A protein has these predicted regions:
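Acidic/Gly/His-enriched mid-domain segments of enzyme catalytic cores or analogous surface patches
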Residues: 2-96, 297-341
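Acidic, Ser/Thr-rich peripheral helices and adjacent loops at domain boundaries
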Residues: 15-24, 28-39, 115-137, 199-210
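Polyanion-binding loop/helix "lid" in catalytic or ligand-binding cores
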Residues: 131-187
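Long, compositionally biased charged/polar accessory segments in the mid-to-C-terminal portions
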Residues: 171-341
């Protein structure tokens, strides 16, 4: 947004979602915020650092929910970066045309930089000429080749690739009468988007928008709440009860059992995500599955070895570690739920 300010472009709305405290001094420093109009609306993710939120005009600050809705029947948004989360929101507003500027999700194809030098994001720089080895793969240092918006291909990072996949997923579900134009010269191509150069845009066709007549602020106020409804609080309390009475109880039962081999332990382990998935409380399911997808393949790989020794002893140790880790995970999640109440 600082680049817009530097070019005397009025900013009517800013979106943010990063939970990092350093944003208060890096992206939203006092000098830059002083240049923003008092009428600028801030849409900020509910995971944003509290210190950052306090710097905004509280009358124009609205929080949106990410990944899970604590407000019953509320809309939540998803994505790996503010870019595709904002796109997710814009698509929900159902505009006729969306123009993507700066959503490159690729490295600078000349310098290898992840972000513009004058941006306030943490910038990394990779050597695009270096031969890539697939013996090791890093989400920070590895480079991936993908289709470019205006080039045959561009280089990107694993983290950006996740955002590209997320963006493609959102655009695949957009309504057909919404046109999404991508102006990125260095960036990745997005499915269901239209590559366009700035010279090809006829700005004479654009209409002046009088935001005073649209009344965005009253609209947002009308469709916002300042606290959880009693029904939402009841849902959260019921989820806590389910986790305490069912999941923690199941973990305790596992801790008491003796397992001769890993296959029997696995049957009891997998029962836990099945219990959650069959309930009305799906959020913790994704957390648990993410954990198991990392761990379980390695355990199967080990115990499928016919030469494995002391299986019963190893399984006992795995049982104890699993119960301890998942119990801690459940308890931490319960603490987070109670904070919302």
């Amino acid at each position: 947004y600082k680049k817009l300010l530097a070019n005397n472009i009025r900013i009517d709305m800013i979106t943010s979602l990063d939970e990092s405290a350093f944003l208060g001094s890096m992206q939203f420093d006092d000098e830059s915020l002083s240049k923003i109009s008092k009428d600028t609306i801030i849409l900020s993710g509910n995971m944003t650092n509290e210190g950052v939120l306090k710097k905004f005009n509280q009358e124009n600050l609205f929080l949106f929910e990410l990944y899970k809705s604590f407000n019953k029947d509320n809309k939540y948004f998803t994505g790996y970066s503010i870019g595709e989360v904002t796109l997710d929101m814009l698509l929900d507003f159902k505009p006729k045309n969306i123009y993507l500027i700066g959503l490159d999700l690729a490295l600078n194809q000349e310098t290898g930089d992840s972000h513009a030098k004058d941006s306030d994001s943490i910038t990394s720089s990779l050597n695009l000429d270096e031969e890539q080895s697939r013996d090791t793969f890093s989400h920070v240092d590895s480079v991936i080749k993908v289709k470019g918006n205006f080039r045959d291909f561009v280089f990107t990072t694993p983290l950006f690739y996740s955002s590209i996949s997320s963006t493609n997923d959102k655009l695949s579900k957009k309504e057909k009468n919404i046109n999404v134009y991508n102006l990125s010269s260095h960036g990745a191509y997005f499915e269901n988007s239209i590559p366009i150069k700035k010279e090809e845009i006829n700005t004479q066709d654009f209409k002046d928008i009088n935001f005073n007549d649209i009344n965005i602020l009253p609209f947002l106020i009308k469709h916002s709440i300042k606290e959880l409804s009693e029904e939402s609080k009841k849902e959260i309390k019921n989820e806590i009860t389910f986790l305490e009475n069912d999941i923690l109880k199941q973990l305790k039962e596992i801790s008491k059992k003796d397992y001769k081999d890993f296959s029997f332990l696995f049957k009891d382990i997998i029962e836990i995500p099945l219990m959650i998935n069959n309930s009305s409380y799906k959020s913790f399911f994704q957390i648990l599955i993410g954990k198991l997808q990392i761990v379980i393949p390695y355990l199967f790989y080990h115990f499928n070895d016919i030469k494995v020794k002391n299986e019963e002893k190893k399984v006992k140790k795995i049982r104890d570690v699993f119960v301890k880790q998942i119990t801690n995970l459940v308890n931490d999640y319960i603490i987070c739920l109670k904070r919302v109440l």
